[in-house]
């Protein structure tokens, strides 16, 4: 399972509830992109969430 190395976001699990309150397991996946960034001064291809890219928390290499 992929995980954002900047914010730590990953797939989370829970229940989908119907009007009659029946429950079915489901998952919410973050929008992860594989990008090249500088890690310790060297370019590396890692998983980063679109939220981290848009907010400017990471710079592309």
From Swiss-Prot:
A GO BP annotation: translation
SUPFAM superfamilies, per the entry: L28p-like
Record has Ribosomal protein as a keyword: yes
Cellular component annotations (GO), alphabetically ordered: ribonucleoprotein complex; ribosome
InterPro entries found in the cross-reference section: Bacterial_rp_bL28, Ribosomal_bL28, Ribosomal_bL28/bL31-like_sf, Ribosomal_bL28_bact-type, Ribosomal_bL28_sf
Family membership noted in the UniProt record: Belongs to the bacterial ribosomal protein bL28 family.
Cross-referenced HAMAP family: Ribosomal_bL28 (MF_00373)
Protein name from the UniProt record: Large ribosomal subunit protein bL28
Species assigned in the record: Lactobacillus gasseri (strain ATCC 33323 / DSM 20243 / BCRC 14619 / CIP 102991 / JCM 1131 / KCTC 3163 / NCIMB 11718 / NCTC 13722 / AM63)
